[in-house]
UniProtKB/Swiss-Prot annotation:
Coiled coil: none annotated. GO terms for cellular component: small ribosomal subunit. Keywords: Ribonucleoprotein, Ribosomal protein, RNA-binding, rRNA-binding. Residues 13-76 form the S5 DRBM domain. This is Small ribosomal subunit protein uS5. The N-terminal domain interacts with the head of the 30S subunit; the C-terminal domain interacts with the body and contacts protein S4. The interaction surface between S4 and S5 is involved in control of translational fidelity. It comes from Chlamydia felis (strain Fe/C-56) (Chlamydophila felis). NCBIfam families: rpsE_bact (TIGR01021). With S4 and S12 plays an important role in translational accuracy. Part of the 30S ribosomal subunit. Contacts proteins S4 and S8. InterPro entries: Ribosomal_Su5_D2-typ_SF (IPR020568), Ribosomal_uS5 (IPR000851), Ribosomal_uS5_bac-type (IPR005712), Ribosomal_uS5_C (IPR005324), Ribosomal_uS5_N (IPR013810), Ribosomal_uS5_N_CS (IPR018192), Ribsml_uS5_D2-typ_fold_subgr (IPR014721). GO terms for biological process: translation.
Amino acid sequence: MTLSKNSHKEDQLEEKVLVVNRCSKVVKGGRKFSFSALILVGDGKGRLGCGFAKANELTDAIRKGGEAARKNLITIETLDGDSIPHEVLVDQDGAQLLLKPAKPGTGIVAGSRIRLILEMAGIKNIVAKSLGSNNPMNQVKAAFKALLSLSSRKDVLQRRRVTHD
């Protein structure tokens, strides 16, 4: 059996269930339950993805969420794979997130959801503060927006059309 390059890369991704939600609908025969799941995948080296899915069975919701997360992979700019290059503050649907770079040895100082996202992204030293909404979906969206807005020194110099070594 031969594995393609894509399937080999996906095998390195770690999958975590961030939130599971159960909804009920009252029908003639009783209650009918459905589930939604928010799934996070990452390799700890700068690749990260998030997926949200709904299904009538919990296992199906988790599986579909994992597939959606693998389709939405992003790559994150870090400083030597350790911290972020600069401070960033983002607003997303009522949730605010502040990310600050930290010195080596600080670790990840953040709430549980944001900590999990940063660990799976491979960031080791960072300070994060979540403000506003505590909705998990909004916090995850804010974290992804913040991580996508990061730019390296090289990118900034290139945008300014400055050549520097």
